[in-house]
């Protein structure tokens, strides 16, 4: 790690300092300039990183997020910090408080969701609480008792409102809901979105990221914002969204995360004597969505695909999402071995030009690869963390350790960048990204 600049001790101290600097009191901004609010899956990963520092503060992070949960069970993808501007679209563009019957009374939120990684954060909080005294364990267990129903309602909403075809796969109505905003996965589906007349807007991201090659184009953004307008037209109603949205895609990666998270939450429920009916539902959803993921896979390689509901077409792309079955399991052994070889081979982690052996968001051999552009090529440390954690959970200790070691080598420059250029290691996007620091803290914790 020294060749990049910082020792493990120095890196952990810098990561902890960063999270303290981004702490707004009861929430952590995803990044101080580009993302000055709370993002849903960022908050879960931030809680993972806070847990080794302070179980109590990690609990506050998730409490704040769950306090913004919608009445139908949805956890919104943004909870806006009071008095903080500098992000578009903000509350005045979403208008969820005015238009959505299920929106929370207190916090201002967006009207879409993000990947359900929160059970993982709860598990890490409980894990770290066991290393401390009775008081800290009590804080974690009291949180679980208080928020168990919120977590189950969140999973129930995903399993019902977002499995619109009963396929065991989560349908997204906006690419932002995937967390992989401009991935090549969505190109064909976005091409069918026709942005009509809508109120003018100014992109705040260009004021922070001046190298526009790192960010989605203006024409892409028009489609993103038009989808928000479509949601507003139907008052963010679940049934109407399923019927009316121009963009409706079954996301195999989010579905795999959901299956995995259901199993994690079910195990937590069993260990903490939660209602048998909840645990049973969680296990059933885990199995249903695992089967839904496996049903998308290529017979030989095991690579997973998304599905465009609107045009009835499978979407095959050389992106990190093709490895969804490695998260949730369920593939026949030979297919799984083949998929692991692909993950570690020259199309992804083993590409000879990569500076670090971690998964790029899009394969360097793909025609869609762009080394500097967001989810079209760069390496995201939080994705390295997710695969490392999942591989450990699945009993692949050596593979998990390799990703951890390579991820730490990459992060040892101390920039805690949102993402990195895969060949040069140049930090890109937002600096001081909270979830990057959180991944480092968990790895070093």
Predicted regions and their residues:
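Core register positions within helices of long alpha-helical scaffolds
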Residues: 49, 121-124, 128, 261, ...
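Long, repeat-rich segments with strong aromatic
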Residues: 244-275, 279-285, 373-399
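Acidic/polar, glycine-enriched structural segments that form the non-catalytic walls/loops
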Residues: 1-34, 130-142, 152-163, 243, ...
